[in-house]
Amino acid sequence: MIKRISISNFKNLLNVPALECDRINALIGPNGSGKSSFLQAIDFLRAFFLTSVEVYLRDHDWDFRDLPNLREARKTISWDIEAELPPGANGRGAGFYHYKVALSPRRYLGVSEECLEYKASFSSPYELLLNREGRSVQWLNRRTGNNEKFKEIGLPASVISRLEPHLAHDKHPELLRFREWVENFRAFLLWDPKVLRTPDRGKHDTLGPSGEHLAPLLAKLKREKPEAFTKLVNRVKRLFPTVSDISVKGGRAWGWQTLHLHEANGHAVVFNSQQMSDGVLRLLALTSLLYLERIHSVITFEEPENGVHPQLIREVVQVLKELTLRKAPNQCQVFFTTHSPYVLDEFFDHPEQVFLVERGRPLEGATIRRLSQRPQLKIVRDAFEQSLGEAWVNGMIGATAGAKL
């Protein structure tokens, strides 16, 4: 998991000093404050482990010129993260990692600086595994114990992206483990009910950013993990008492597959995905993540409670918390944004898991701090009796819209 992260010059994040992160992290603040920028900056780390950063930009329809903070003259964007990782599938690579990387547009877009340090235990000193400054690259060969020069010039991504696992597993086991962890990040946007209910086909192990592949994903779960699928259905039935079953129709070979919702109240009725409610679809998609065999190492969500009845928002937060309780090698960390005071209420006993995101003036960089650092927190909790959300709406803890109503 990410233990600490610092980001410089990425969109609204002009200079975010080192933030201590938890297994689950909620971001609150007004529109345009920088919450989404923070989530995007985390997911952008995946770009360095593709063949080129440009691939990530094309996939997201981004132009690099739109990424640096508009107030800053320099265009270099930098990340500095510390992470604690469990062992990989091969049982290697557990420990603490410190990774620094900078993205700069010179004659071409590329990585101008990259450094990875590692230690097996918290009390051990860091060992330098990779150091890159411009075209000068050195990395540690575990097999020989020597630092070696990397010879490729003008690499538009991380040096680690060039490693072949079958050739480098004994030379660079920690580099491969770190890459594996970052490659397994997943960013979920606002889940679109239109996308969730659309018939789909093919084999998929997870949902797409906007909720793509829900039908084939559930079909695979029912086929390969029937007990897990039954648990998912039972959980949905508990939330929606009129629901009696969920099924997926079609899908022979590579055919299209469609969700169906069954209800029973004296007589059975079957609704296809086009007739299912938005809230049911969203909760079904979110809850399905709990029962997948493999889960992402870091997940970011944009407003996962969106479209869900207020009485069920507690269930949304509960699912997110349960995702973070999975054991190695499926450990998962969650970052999400919210505008719901009901969500904030669920963190009354853990304000250290809430980040306040604010911007004072136009073009000013975002400030991000833990709610637990607010000096007035104790007074607010005593005054508002179990409702941080009410205190937030009333402007008592900051991160408010500032609208003059």
Predicted features and spans:
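Conserved P-loop NTP-binding catalytic core
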Residues: 40-108
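N-terminal pre-Walker A segment at the start of P-loop NTPase domains
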Residues: 1-14
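Short glycine-/polar-rich loops that comprise or flank the Walker A/P-loop
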Residues: 76-77, 107-109, 183-184, 350-353
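Conserved ABC ATPase signature
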Residues: 213, 230, 234-291, 298-313
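Electropositive, glycine-dotted interaction segments
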Residues: 89-234, 238
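Phosphate-binding glycine-rich loops of NTP-binding sites
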Residues: 23-60, 282-289, 318-319, 337, ...
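Phosphate-binding P-loop
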Residues: 16-22, 291-294, 327-328
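C-terminal lobe/lid and adjacent interdomain/linker elements of RecA-like ASCE P-loop ATPase modules
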Residues: 314-405
